[in-house]
Amino acid sequence: MAGIVWGDVESFGVHYDMSHLRPAVHQVVTKSGMLSIEITFGFHVFTDEKGNGKPIRHKMERRYFCQNRYEGSKTLTERILGAVDGDYVTAFIAGTSGQRYYHLNLHDDFILMEIRKPSGTDGFLRLHVVSAYTLDQWGEVPRGKNLPFEFVLSQRAAGTNRL
């Protein structure tokens, strides 16, 4: 399995269990059939730059543990899987890197994802949650094309990279 297994975090004397952020494979039904989706989570899912929590380093990046993001991360898998049938994602290409991303907006939540089909696989996708947080009243989301989430997953599984 790909992805990082995040260790538990101790921040200001409080222990935070990170086991819910371990990579896991889930089965989803789409119009084109059953898909296996491996969901993994990035560093920004439980950290921010505000400096209110314990400083944490990952690779060359330093951020701070964020209790609000951590609490929101506990239901990320369920929210993502629940959105497959009927919700929309916005597809966009990041200006600086040219990387294709998708964001899922559920109520006030912003969930930024990469969705990839590993070469040589059928019926399997890797969905990496890059970041997830609640938008404040000034929050802006990247503009792009709104597409049914289920359609995007089906097309990515079929090898289409232009969505």
Which stretches of residues belong to each language-model region?
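Ribonuclease/tRNase effector modules and their secretory precursors
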Residues: 1-163
